[in-house]
Amino acid sequence: MKKVLITGITGMIGKHLAKSLHQKGYEVAGLSRATSASRYLIEKPFYKHFQGDILDEKFLRNVWKSWQPDLVYHLAAQAYNGESWNAEDTTYLLNIKGSRNVFETCREYSPKARIIPACSSAEYGFVPEDMIPINEDITPLKPITPYGVSKAAMEMMARQFHLNFGMDVVLPRLFIHVGPDHHPSQTMLRKRTCAFGPQARRLCKGIQKRH
């Protein structure tokens, strides 16, 4: 049975991915920081949960030595594009330095494992109409936000690990996705509101009744 490790397992994607992989017969483990969401995993008997930070290299080494994954999904990140303007340092630290820690630990302790880091459509920036639909082989990466820059850097770093060390790397660039457990502040409703203005208030006629 293949062993899977998911970083950022308590996020929206991580939760559903873990459940899907478990149903397909994989042994699943994941890591996340000490948040209330971590209790979701502790209550699930089919998960092994490691609590810690991808910035902690010693923690990562202990996880890899303990679990020895065959497949790694790297989802842990500062994952909000717009908010990256208010958290540039955190975005670059987690998404670049943290990712480098994950790649290096995987290279050292599970060199034959496949690693799938979550890249992003934010790496493209604004795409001219004449380049739509996007072709991942020819559309240039021109990120315009700290988040987009951090993800482009992470992707190039992953390619470097593949080219220089022969690591098995798959690089999906994820576009906007919504679903159960998505944080309310990131829903399509909020995006619609930002695009078209606030929702009209509902006006009612007050009626008094005597019972």
Q: Predicted segments — roles?
A:
Residues 54-94:
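NAD(P)H-binding glycine-rich loop region in Rossmannoid oxidoreductase-like domains
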Residues 4-24:
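N-terminal Rossmann NAD(P)H-binding glycine-rich loop of SDR-like oxidoreductase domains
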Residues 7, 31, 72-78, 115-121, ...:
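SDR active-site strand-loop-helix element
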Residues 86-101, 114, 123-171, 182-186:
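Catalytic helix-loop patch of NAD(P)-dependent Rossmann-fold dehydrogenases
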Residues 45-55:
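Rossmann-fold cofactor-recognition segment
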